[in-house]
Curated annotation (Swiss-Prot):
Annotated positions binding Mg(2+) 2: 69
Chain residues that bind substrate: 28, 42, 54, 140
Location in the cell: Cytoplasm
Keywords, ordered alphabetically: Cytoplasm, Hydrolase, Magnesium, Metal-binding
InterPro entries given in the database record: Pyrophosphatase, Pyrophosphatase_sf
Gene3D superfamilies associated with the record: Inorganic pyrophosphatase
UniProt function note: Catalyzes the hydrolysis of inorganic pyrophosphate (PPi) forming two phosphate ions.
Gene Ontology molecular-function annotations: inorganic diphosphate phosphatase activity; magnesium ion binding
Keyword match Membrane: no
UniProt family annotation: Belongs to the PPase family.
Main location: cytoplasm
Protein name: Inorganic pyrophosphatase
């Protein structure tokens, strides 16, 4: 896979997310930026699993030196390496041992799964879903030496767009 050829899409309603880790996985995969191969990074040290499909937006550069992270919230796992068009609904603001590490929040766009059309912002999600996401990121590194996470709060689509636009500028 040539990541440089994957377009960012139309902000905020048709963002192309590259999935690295399927919903429900306890294995952390990363796509090797040079070869495009899906590499096993590690098995989660904690007895937990990813609460959403986890990936990134190609051709962006977040403050942590990686492409900007994104969670695609839906009810089914998406294969690692797949690209899914999605719509931004918010962002989870957090920090880890490497610095700020925000996670954009998105849902599949209407063509992919129209069941999410009524989700306009993260506050439209069930509180239980938000609690699971927050709990996951508060605890997923707890058993890993020299790693830590500080989860702050969820913010709206406007904050997500600002983070994405900054990451696009950082990449150029």
């Amino acid at each position: 896979m040539n990541l440089s050829k994957i377009k960012i899409g139309d902000i905020p309603n048709k963002i192309n997310a590259v999935i690295e880790i399927p919903y429900g996985s306890n294995i952390k995969y990363e796509i090797d930026k040079d070869s495009g191969a899906i590499m096993v990074d590690r098995v989660m040290a904690s007895a937990i699993f990813y609460p959403a499909n986890y990936g990134f937006i190609a051709n962006t550069l977040a403050d942590d030196g990686d492409p900007v992270d994104i969670l695609v919230l839906n009810e089914y796992p998406i294969q690692a390496g797949a690209v899914i068009p999605c719509r931004l609904i918010g962002v989870l603001i957090m920090e880890d041992e490497s610095g700020m590490d925000e996670k954009l929040l998105a849902v599949p766009n209407s063509k992919i799964d129209a069941r999410y059309d009524n989700i306009k912002t993260y506050t439209d999600l069930p509180q239980a879903t938000l609690n699971k996401i927050k709990n996951f990121f508060e605890t997923y590194k707890i058993l890993e030496p020299n790693k830590w996470v500080k989860v702050q709060d969820f913010k709206d689509e406007k904050a997500a767009i600002e983070i994405l636009e900054k990451a696009i500028k950082n990449y150029k």
